Curated annotation (Swiss-Prot):
Organism for this UniProt entry: Salmonella choleraesuis (strain SC-B67)
Subunit structure of this chain's protein: Monomer in solution. Oligomerizes to an active state in the presence of the positive effectors ATP and maltotriose.
Similarity comment: family membership: Belongs to the MalT family.
Domain HTH luxR-type: 829-894
Activity regulation, per record: Activated by ATP and maltotriose, which are both required for DNA binding.
Protein's UniProt name: HTH-type transcriptional regulator MalT
Annotated Pfam families: GerE, TPR_MalT
Keywords attached to this entry: Activator, ATP-binding, Carbohydrate metabolism, DNA-binding, Nucleotide-binding, Transcription, Transcription regulation
GO BP of this protein: positive regulation of carbohydrate metabolic process; positive regulation of DNA-templated transcription
NCBIfam families found in the cross-reference section: PRK04841.1 (NF003420)
């Protein structure tokens, strides 16, 4: 819940001096990216900008305090301020900020700018007191903000010092409007106007000018002169002499003498007590100061000119001028030390009554009241956790003694979930074990079940599925239905374990249950996770169309709940890329993989390993080995500089082994095979993939017998567990083994099985990646004209893909190749004496690649009759009568040139 006063522009008071000369300068602010107003405290920065902002409807205002160094809090208020300025135009960004569903501040701002691209009118955001920001992450994000904000957007920053926002760069590019303390200082005319409005008796212009010079135009000093003159009934000139040459460091002494010592005791206590509030309203004042009518007292203090300012148009919220508020808080610690804890307790209670637990925690911490802090956390901690107020919660829990946590074990559970969210898995188990050992009496069964649900999540994250399953089952046996969050966690973990064990149908059922529960209780990250798992399971079962449709539901959920910046979004686009790759939609697959990398742009580079693997896969399917090698260099660098889950390594190894196969790099394959782990089982698609990598390397090295043993066992497991996509992949690799070992009939048999299974999976690229050996077999099958219609159609499609992406290596008779061929000493004499034209060589290459006459005509963009003429001519020159003879002739030429066909 946001405090309204932090988003309200200060109210313009009637007795303030209108700074016409500075307003004229600010009138051109829309021509600059940044308008920067800097000066020490008390020079009128806020007053000036509030005058300039008057009448501007499309302007947001954000008043900072020390608590805004929390990234999540900063983001929520900044987006809310822009929402006020735009009338709710940026709803997606607002939802992401409120639910903390963004990867970083920069990624949230990137989404904001996408929405603001549709906003075409001038727009302003004022950030007041930016000097309070000390968090370097926020500084970095605001530099990003300034670099990328729309041209019609102006950021206005008020600060006591030069902020770390890349000011020099903006200044050089003439994108910075600056107003500093020298310009903010009152001139003689403004000082005269000021005193005329504040003093009951007018003073001469010369005296006003002299006093202005004495304090160097410092607005706070002028205000103190007027206040002192009114309170003490002395001349303004006397006060001016006391203030001459004073600076902020000596201001405290002056404020004690001239302000605090000149108000009655009741007002003095009111000022000191109320100053602990960063913002205040009637209810807070009544509780903190004991005054019966807080609103009336605030208005009275305002009329006395005691540095109190309204923060909204309704006059409900107030705050002290920052310098005066800081001074009062310091005096409060000295003068009311014995009462200070009680004052903070009263503030915490009032904030709680108004529904602001974060502010209440701030005061409970300041009061050092562990019991109050505990009570606030017991009632509101889980809400704060779900809104990612993690830093505040961690600070609060550290402030509680361990004994207090033991007396309230749900707070121990909260601390453990905080550790889990930070991937501190070993600490989670240590904490829970210690708590169970030291909690006095019999531990509540439901709480124990919640502990087990969390432990189950930690176990599966840490790669221990057996322990995860045991704990998840224990949790589900004991958790009441009302404990929905822990039940969602335990059900999800159980489903994931069954996925790892190869029990796909039961795993799918549990993930569907998880989705239903998560949607019902608005636990959106688990709803998304369950959809991703369902899609993976359906892919493994060979139901790729069903997997596609599940992914569509996941994308819709991301859009509806603004989950675009969760790391899980990368998981979804990655499995979409895998599916697109399988269907040979390579451009779309590559785009999806790159969008996954973009989602992870603010994370460590190691997190991008899976998407980078897919980019290599796309290059390999296209036959672009140079690009694949470049990407592999980066991939192998990441592998050497991080620790990864076994399935991540298996996926990375897959593209490495395929690359070695395509380049004939037996040395690398042999070295890898010596060191790679050999899993004990192959009962899920992760382990199947690793064993398939091993078999592929063995085939490359000519180790056909051990490779066949591996593949036959993989097929047996895949059939029993219904891992149909893995079975399809295994059959293709077994086909290559039979083909290379000369067992042509066996090769044809398993290829027919693979083609039939592909009717279900839709696989294309898995065939294409095997290159010319696959193309030769498919040509033979097509020419036999015995394939069923669907298999015939798929075989032709695969041949076209191989021809498109691999023709340059095998079947593309370009000019350079033909020139080398004609100069070869073993070239047939018939070709040397009756050479083919360049077009006839192209036609021969396409015939060899399995193209029909119509397809050749389409490829070369000529009439079918022209193709028939070319074919008749090249048959005559080659001395052949039939198409199959031409294919065999082309194959002999390629072999002669050293191509392994």
């Amino acid at each position: 819940m946001l405090i309204p006063s932090k988003l309200s522009r200060p109210v313009r008071l009637d007795h303030t001096v209108v700074r016409e000369r500075l307003l004229a300068k600010l009138s051109g602010a829309n021509n600059f990216r940044l308008a920067l107003v800097t000066s020490p405290a008390g020079y009128g920065k806020t007053t000036l900008v509030s005058q300039w902002a008057a009448g501007k409807n499309e302007l947001g205002w954000y008043s900072l305090d020390e608590g805004d160094n929390q990234q999540e809090r900063f983001a929520s208020y900044l987006i809310a301020a822009i929402q006020q300025a735009t009338g709710g135009h940026c709803s997606t960004s607002e939802a992401m900020a409120q639910k903390r569903q963004y990867a970083s501040l920069t990624s949230l701002f990137a989404q904001l700018f996408i929405e603001l691209a549709q906003w075409h009118r001038p727009l302003y955001l004022v950030i007041d007191d930016y000097h309070l920001i000390t968090n370097p992450v926020i500084h970095d994000a605001m530099r990003f903000f300034l670099r990328h904000q729309p041209e019609n957007f102006t950021l206005v920053v008020l600060s006591r010092n030069l902020p770390q926002l890349g000011i020099a760069n903006l200044r050089v590019r003439d994108q910075l409007l600056e107003i500093g303390s020298q310009q903010l200082a009152f001139n003689h005319q403004e000082a005269k106007q000021f005193f005329d409005r504040r003093l009951s008796s007018p003073i001469e212009a010369a005296e006003s000018s002299r006093m202005c010079d004495d304090v160097a135009g410092w607005a706070t000093a002028l205000q103190l002169i007027a206040l002192s003159a009114r309170q003490n009934h002395t001349s303004a000139h006397h006060s001016a002499r006391r203030l001459a040459g004073i600076n902020a460091s000596h201001l405290s002494d002056y404020l004690v003498d001239e302000v605090l010592d000149n108000v009655d005791v009741s007002t003095r206590h009111f000022l000191l007590k109320s100053a602990i509030l960063r913002s205040m309203n009637d209810a807070l004042i009544v509780r903190v100061t004991g005054e019966e009518n807080g609103q009336m007292r605030l208005e009275e203090i305002e009329r006395q000119g005691l540095f109190l300012q309204r923060m909204d148009d309704t006059g409900e919220w107030f705050s002290y001028h920052p310098s005066f508020g800081s001074f009062l808080r310091q005096r409060c610690q000295w003068e009311l030390a014995a009462e200070l804890s009680e004052i903070h307790r009263a503030a915490a209670e009032s904030w709680m009554e108004q529904g602001f637990p974060s502010e209440a925690i701030h005061h409970a911490l300041a009061a050092g009241d562990a019991q109050m802090l505990r009570d606030i956390l017991l009632n509101h901690a889980w809400g704060l956790f779900n809104h990612s107020e993690l830093a505040l919660l961690e600070e609060s829990l550290k402030a509680l003694p361990w004994e207090s946590l033991l007396e309230n074990p749900r707070l121990v559970l909260l601390q453990a979930w905080l550790m889990q969210s930070q991937h501190r898995y070993s600490e989670v188990n240590t904490l829970l074990a210690r708590a169970e050992q030291e909690i006095k009496g019999v531990m509540d069964g439901t709480l124990h079940a919640e502990f087990n649900a969390l432990r189950a999540q930690v176990a599966i994250n840490d790669g221990n599925p057996e322990e995860a399953e045991r704990l998840a089952k224990l949790a589900l046996d004991e958790l009441p239905l009302a404990w929905f969050y822990s039940r969602i966690v335990a059900t999800s973990v159980h489903g994931e374990v069954l996925h790892c064990k190869g029990d796909l149908s039961q795993s799918l059922s549990l993930m569907q249950q998880t989705e239903q529960m998560a949607r019902h209780h608005d636990v959106w990250h688990y709803a998304l996770w369950s959809l991703i798992q369902q899609s993976e399971i359906q892919f493994a079962q060979g139901f790729l169309q069903a997997a596609w449709e599940t992914q569509e539901r996941a994308f819709q959920l991301i859009k509806e709940q603004h989950l675009e910046q969760l790391p899980m979004h990368e998981f979804l686009v990655r499995i979409r890329a895998q599916l697109l790759w399988a269907w040979a939609r390579l451009d779309e697959a590559e785009a999806s993989a790159r969008s996954g990398i973009a989602v992870l742009s603010t994370f460590q580079p190691q997190q991008q390993l899976q998407c980078l693997t897919l980019l290599v896969q796309c290059s390999l399917a296209r036959g672009d080995l140079d690009n694949a090698r470049s990407q592999l260099n980066r991939l192998e660098n990441l592998l050497g500089n991080g620790r990864y889950h076994c399935d991540w390594i298996s996926n990375a190894d897959k593209v490495r082994v395929i690359y070695w196969q395509l380049t004939g790099d037996k040395k690398s394959a042999a070295n890898w095979l010596r060191h790679t782990p050999k899993p004990a089982f192959a009962n899920n698609h992760f382990l199947q993939g690793q064993w398939r990598n091993i078999a592929r390397a063995q085939i490359l090295l000519g180790e056909f017998e051990p490779a066949e043993i591996v593949l036959e066992e993989l097929n047996e497991n895949a059939r029993s567990l219904r891992l149909m996509s893995d079975l399809n992949r295994n059959l293709l690799l077994l086909n290559q083994l039979y083909w290379q070992s000369g067992r042509k009939n066996d090769a044809q048999r398993v290829l027919l099985d693979a083609l039939q299974l592909a009717n279900r999976t839709g696989f294309i690229s898995h065939f294409v990646i095997e290159g010319e050996a696959m193309a030769q077999q498919l040509r033979q099958l097509i020419q036999l004209n015995t394939l069923p219609e669907m298999e015939q159609h798929r075989a032709q499609r695969i041949l076209r893909e191989i021809n498109q992406h691999h023709r340059h290596k095998f079947a593309h008779f370009d000019e350079g190749f033909v020139e080398r061929l004609l100069n070869h000493p073993d070239v047939p004499e018939l070709i040397r004496t009756s050479p083919l034209t360049q077009r006839e060589w192209q036609v021969l290459g396409l015939i060899y690649s399995g193209y029909s006459n119509e397809q050749i005509a389409g490829e070369l963009a000529v009439a079918a009759t022209t193709i028939k003429t070319h074919i008749r001519n090249l048959y005559q020159k080659l001395g052949v009568a039939h198409r199959q003879d031409a294919v065999q002739h082309a194959q002999q030429l390629l072999k002669m040139m050293g191509y392994g066909v």
